[in-house]
């Protein structure tokens, strides 16, 4: 993320997610952007005490190939809703255009879209579109939940300018609301609710945040060993049956070129006897002393999925201390997954 000071005194902050392998699920991009931006903006705003000054707003914009894609659609909506304040409009709407899933191709489609907007504006008689009506429009017009990245890179930008936010901790919730408003059906129809951000801010109660994480997100981190390969080359995959992650520890320093097997060694069972006796995770990520810009390219370039903890570490170069504390507090005892069956059989034969 790189903050840029504007002449008006505002600060724009952006998080870029790069894709080198074609289309990627937009939900993945959104979740990574939320994690990164919430952490960084919270720290920056707390340091500058920005919330003691003028109120701030956020808008969510997706760029493809470095070109802003939302301005044309915002202008169309401004024409259809003359009463709508421009800042309110930009705060609530984000449009995906170009080679992506959402755009208006024909005059007929444009007329239909503007008609929907006009009906809502007349019915509400307000200066903004309420969330339910906005979602109904996007459900009809945004059919594909995948953002096709045909250019060299895509950029996710969150800007805050003029709408009030009570505290820095409210940033994550605001971002989640904006993202859910532009996704068809939000982040899913699970009764557990939508995305909740996980940050590494020291004074944030992560337990309350992480408890509400969408199960789809949690499932991505439930990994187990593949019995068809040796322990040192096991591939990570989703486990629908395992209850929680089985991570052991990290031994060495961060390196972008690192083989993932040494980054996330939860499929290694050298310390099995200790884990069997104590059922507790002793995460020992080694913190880097120098500061660096978060690098999401390590996630795109990694062929195997990572656990949530190592994913955070690879991007930010520091351990997710609060996430680890929460995990150990909640699942540290009597929740360790059993080792693969072939590993159990091997130990029996060696006795």
UniProtKB/Swiss-Prot annotation:
Alphabetically ordered keywords of this record: Cell cycle, Cell division, Cytoplasm, Cytoskeleton, Mitosis, Phosphoprotein
Cellular component, GO, one term: spindle pole
Modified residues (Phosphoserine): 100, 106
Compartments (UniProt record): Cytoplasm, Cytoskeleton, Spindle pole
Modification Phosphothreonine occurs at: 211
Disordered: annotated span: 1-20, 223-249
Residue stretches of biased makeup (Basic residues): 232-249
Record's compositionally biased regions (Polar residues): 1-14
Principal location: cytoplasm
Superkingdom classification of source: Eukaryota
Gene Ontology BP term (one): mitotic spindle assembly checkpoint signaling
SUBUNIT field: Interacts with BFA1.
Role played: Part of a checkpoint which monitors spindle integrity and prevents premature exit from mitosis. This cell-cycle arrest depends upon inhibition of the G-protein TEM1 by the BFA1/BUB2 complex.
Entry protein name: Protein IBD2
Source organism (scientific name): Saccharomyces cerevisiae (strain ATCC 204508 / S288c) (Baker's yeast)
